[in-house]
């Protein structure tokens, strides 16, 4: 990439750092993890949770959500100004699950946001520690990506549900900063831009006045983030067109959808980080592990090692399969919702199934669900091998892919060819190459036509034994090509919107 000099590594985004060396980055990320861990320990004490209850992923999600809500300044301001019945803008809470007389009970807790902020800051040496908050947002986003298929959101913005491999990070809040922007997929950025343009079409004043100036600069910033994710000159030139438009409208929406479709073959670079639930960091810190001193990376072996030695439990509904629940959470932990299942099966050491074949609903339990028959079980989050996370789209390639999802977005930097259904993707590009972007469109289509099935991505990269911490002996996996590669294959996963 030509602009490599100006790109910051994610750890730098993660640490607001000016150029740091690897050791400083590892210490800095470790410090963030320490803070989350200390906060979690303190919250478990406040809530009087037993060790087992503290390792329950549902409790972890509630505690994470409470602190994210306590620091959501815009929403807090909004709630103060628009009071709604029965909602105290100064309080936050959620369901906490406890084991009472051999049964799981739900208890709704409520805390002052101020108190939660105090506990968080105290755990983070008095800082607001926004990076730790963003880290938890990305974990929630990865869990959503693995649990739900954003069919409706795609259709609403005029995209095709089969483009779901482009939707990483589609539920990340706007306030998730540079680290959040790095993990957003092409489709997510396109969707945000289309929503913005549609508002501009419907609301005369959207681009006008003092507010309009802010809106415009946000629009251009988002265009630039998206441009930075594309890896070909023609796709980037198209983004310049969209960004420079005097009055963004339907022509821009067309161009954006075109560029999103093209990303199924000419993939963009999207960062992947293994963000784990707070209930993994807490026990590690309380056992005396010093993340800052030891150093930690979100893209190397560290999360794998941590999960090898962690006990995490989950509530299981009566007709759910605990192994399937484990797969869901394992994929979320490694930000692997859109990775090739054959590679995931190889790394995990057990078969990873498409979403539609899993007998499990989401991890969260709704407030109206009956607790009487709830069991709990251990989540199996260990792996057979580990691999380095990638932020490139890999080169392009085509292969028999599935009806539901017609491309993948690689998570791991491991040699393989990347499946996508070329004929299906190309069928979307009939005809429309006129207009201002015609030469770019023609160029993009030409590159897509040229994508060859035998091309291998991440050549020479492999997975590593868990004992191989320095990544010295790459093992290049061999795949059974008859297997299905896509997770959301012909799928019936619940949609996130419900």
Curated annotation (Swiss-Prot):
PTM comment: Late in virus-infected cells, may be cleaved from a 56-kDa protein to a 53-kDa protein by a cellular caspase. This cleavage might be a marker for the onset of apoptosis in infected cells or have a specific function in virus host interaction.
Region (Disordered): 1-21
Gene Ontology biological process terms in this record: symbiont entry into host cell; viral penetration into host nucleus
Biased composition (Basic and acidic residues): 8-21
GO cellular component, one term: host cell nucleus
Stored SUPFAM superfamilies: flu NP-like
GO molecular function, one term: structural molecule activity
Localization, UniProt: Virion; Host nucleus
Motif (Bipartite nuclear localization signal): 198-216
Positions occupied by motif Unconventional nuclear localization signal: 1-18
Keywords for this protein: Capsid protein, Helical capsid protein, Host nucleus, Host-virus interaction, Ribonucleoprotein, RNA-binding, Viral nucleoprotein, Viral penetration into host nucleus, Virion, Virus entry into host cell
Ribonucleoprotein as UniProt keyword: yes
Quaternary assembly: Homomultimerizes to form the nucleocapsid. May bind host exportin-1/XPO1. Binds to viral genomic RNA. Protein-RNA contacts are mediated by a combination of electrostatic interactions between positively charged residues and the phosphate backbone and planar interactions between aromatic side chains and bases.
Role of this protein: Encapsidates the negative strand viral RNA, protecting it from nucleases. The encapsidated genomic RNA is termed the ribonucleoprotein (RNP) and serves as template for transcription and replication. The RNP needs to be localized in the host nucleus to start an infectious cycle, but is too large to diffuse through the nuclear pore complex. NP comprises at least 2 nuclear localization signals that are responsible for the active RNP import into the nucleus through cellular importin alpha/beta pathway.
Family membership noted in the UniProt record: Belongs to the influenza viruses nucleoprotein family.
Name listed for the protein in its UniProt record: Nucleoprotein
Originating organism: Influenza A virus (strain A/Memphis/5/1980 H3N2)
Origin organism lineage: Viruses, Riboviria, Orthornavirae, Negarnaviricota, Polyploviricotina
